[in-house]
Amino acid sequence: MADWDELEAALADYTAQCNGNERLRRMQRDWSRRLHFTCTDNGVTFTMEVERGEIVAVERGHVGVPDIVVSTDSETFCDMFWGDLNPVQKYLRGEITVRGSQEDVLRLDAISYVIWPES
């Protein structure tokens, strides 16, 4: 089970990877959303703010009203944010749940394929 410090480190790496990917930023330039994440094993929650395709904030706890809610265990979140696994496979197996509009779920799929193209 991962604690907040480990999650925060993984999120920092993921933020740098996403914000540094020009292709991804161009592709998502019209996408601004608030995402809530919930760790099902330890109750840790966090919020990610995306503005015009750039991750501009990540903070502990749920802040504001989400456009998308993602839930899984803390280790899966860490592995996902560090790029050690493709979240699409876990999503298809029901190990990651995503609540949001169909368009937003498809956007998350597209982000996954840009970040993890070999999957």
Spans of model-derived segments:
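Feature captures hydrophobic
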Residues: M1-S119
